Each structure stands twice: as structure tokens, then as C-alpha cells.
Design a protein with these regions (language model features):
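Ser/Thr-rich, low-complexity intrinsically disordered terminal regions
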Residues: 34, 38-62
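Extended Gly/Ser/Thr-rich low-complexity repeat segments
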Residues: 31-35, 67-72, 87-99
Length: 141
């Protein structure tokens, strides 16, 4: 994971929030930050059980997610522009749903105006196998 505390965050026009019910919010928050940190800038603070994901893989940031843990809830606050909001909901949510497939995690986003965003999970073993095969096909394996 890289620390982005010194980098200025751009201002994004759209917001979306997901509250993921789980007995282990800190475990999933830390896992999400560590996994996503291979390709984007992330942080995770064990003491405060908070973190961030900055979607800056291709240079300028296209969105950011703030992670926070509460009693049996992992809360995700996504900020992005119109062009990237739905895709970043999907990318963030599907990773989390995949990590928590055995627990049946569901990530349902609610947009700032109160309208539903995208939903990821719960994932079945068949879903996971299909996703694995699709990923391998994209990577040319």
C-alpha cells in the first residue's frame, strides 16, 4: 500500500455510499486496501480502522473511496465524476463481494440524491468460477 496523505485530492461532483454488513469490517477493509494497493494508491490505518482508495492508475485520479469501520458495518464513501462513478462502484464492490463470498457479502450503493447505484453480491461458487475464467481469458491464459 502506498501512502497518499501528501497528495491533494481532486474535487469530484458525484457521491455514492455503501454500508456493508459483516462481522469483520476491519478485516475486509484492510484486505480491500491491500489488494487494490497493487494498482492504485491506498491507505489503511489499523488503529482508527479507516482507509482510502485513490483511483489513480492512469495518472490523474478519477475517483476516491474512504473506508471506515463501525459495529458490524464497513462503510464506503465514493467520490467521482459522472463518467467514472458507476464503474468505480462496480470495481470496488465486486472486489469486496468476491473477498466475502463465503459470508455472502452484498455491496449496494446509494447515490447522493438517494437513488440506487449498482449492487455487487452475493456471489455463488458458480459466479466466482465464471469471473475467474473471464479474468484468465482477458489475461490470455
Amino acid at each position: 500500500m502506498t501512502n497518499s496523505a501528501d497528495s491533494a485530492q481532486p474535487v469530484f461532483s458525484r457521491r455514492s455510499t455503501a454500508r456493508v454488513s459483516t462481522d469483520r469490517p476491519s478485516r475486509y477493509g484492510k484486505q480491500l486496501a491491500a489488494h487494490m494497493g497493487r494498482k492504485i494508491t491506498t491507505t489503511w490505518d489499523e488503529a482508527s480502522q479507516t482507509g482510502s482508495l485513490t483511483f489513480d492508475r492512469e495518472g490523474a485520479a478519477t475517483g476516491a473511496v474512504e473506508l471506515s469501520c463501525h459495529d458490524d458495518i464497513l462503510q464506503l464513501h465514493l467520490a467521482a465524476d459522472d463518467a467514472h462513478l458507476e464503474r468505480l462502484e462496480q470495481v470496488t464492490g465486486i472486489h469486496l463481494a468476491r473477498f466475502g463470498a463465503k459470508e455472502g457479502l452484498v455491496v449496494s450503493w446509494i447515490r447522493q440524491e438517494g437513488t440506487p447505484g449498482t449492487t455487487q453480491g452475493p456471489l455463488t461458487p458458480e459466479d466466482l468460477e465464471r469471473m475467474r475464467a473471464e479474468r484468465e481469458a482477458r489475461q490470455g491464459k
